[in-house]
């Protein structure tokens, strides 16, 4: 967990215990992690409690496997607990392989049944940074994008560095 120490010395610990990196699974000499604070008061955290995960949302979980490129420069990880059955997270953006936001070139994110994270490995070595991107909801049964997340585009300022993987 992350710990925020305020100017007065008071400590605030972020919520959750699911942010784990398996360093043995990452084949590189350098790792850069770009993460966000998870405040305990965020209402979304209630959907990761045992009552929701084991009972109320158990039927809606969809596991999905994706292939990784031979060379990986960036790994995107995101959680989304309130998807319907057969829905997964996808990613699109201004990078080359997404064909500049094309809805026919979406990147479907993989998810194992035991993990709360959707994950996608990409090779962005031929792209210009910064890169704009968004997550979306994709229906595997309908084979189409349902919607992109609301709000401004996310921006990735972390370019490819030799022998480094960036985890977002």
Residues of each region from the PLM?
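Histidine (H) residue identity feature
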Residues: 1, 39, 74, 105, ...
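Aromatic-rich carbohydrate-binding modules that target alpha-glucans
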Residues: 5-26, 80-128, 138-161
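Compositionally biased low-complexity segments at domain edges in trafficked proteins
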Residues: 28-72, 84, 162-168
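A short, amphipathic beta-strand motif
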Residues: 73-79
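Exposed beta-strand face motif in extracellular beta-rich ectodomains
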Residues: 129-133
């Amino acid at each position: 967990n992350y710990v925020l120490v305020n100017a007065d010395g008071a400590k605030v610990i972020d919520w959750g215990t699911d942010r784990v990196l398996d360093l043995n699974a990452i084949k590189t000499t350098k790792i850069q992690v770009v993460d966000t604070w998870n405040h305990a008061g965020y209402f979304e955290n209630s959907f990761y409690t045992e009552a929701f995960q084991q009972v109320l949302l158990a039927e809606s979980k969809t596991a999905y496997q994706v292939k990784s490129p031979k060379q990986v420069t960036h790994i995107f990880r995101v959680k989304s607990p309130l998807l319907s059955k057969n829905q997964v997270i996808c990613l699109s953006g201004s990078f080359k392989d997404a064909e500049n936001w094309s809805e026919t070139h979406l990147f479907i994110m993989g998810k194992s049944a035991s993990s709360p994270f959707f994950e996608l490995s990409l090779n962005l070595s031929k792209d210009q940074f910064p890169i704009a991107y968004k997550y979306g909801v994709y229906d595997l049964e309908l084979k189409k994008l349902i919607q992109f997340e609301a709000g401004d585009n996310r921006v990735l300022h972390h370019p490819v560095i030799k022998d480094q993987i960036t985890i977002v």
